[in-house]
Amino acid sequence: MLLENQVETDVLVIGGGIAGCFAAIKAKEQGLDVTIVDKAYAGKSGASIGACRSWMVYNPEWGVDFNECMNAFNTEGEYINHREWDEIILNESLAIYHDLVSWGVKFPPD
């Protein structure tokens, strides 16, 4: 039996993992109507459930060299990462970390 459900939305997010949920929240903060579509329950399927202990945040005030962080990031990704994307991710990681903390996300200590 084919089921069809038409939904009008400003933003359609495919995938309810960490990135999808984050994108949906940020779009909703802009006053947009958001719909998330996932194969299971948001946050309960896909790669995000295994990534909960693999966060890397870059803060230049911590005195850590950016290139050291990039090298660690590439090592964790077994050198199959796209370096330009990694650079964007690290440069935006602190702001994203602060957003998540402000939403009540608890991070494990170092």
Question: What are these regions, as identified by a protein language model?
Answer:
Residues 1-8:
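A short, basic/flexible loop-to-alpha-helix module at the beginning of a structural domain
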Residues 2, 16-20, 86:
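Generic alpha-helix initiation/capping and coil-helix boundary signal
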Residues 4, 32-33, 104:
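Generic secretory/membrane-interface signal
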Residues 39-110:
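Conserved N-terminal/central alpha/beta ligand/cofactor-binding core
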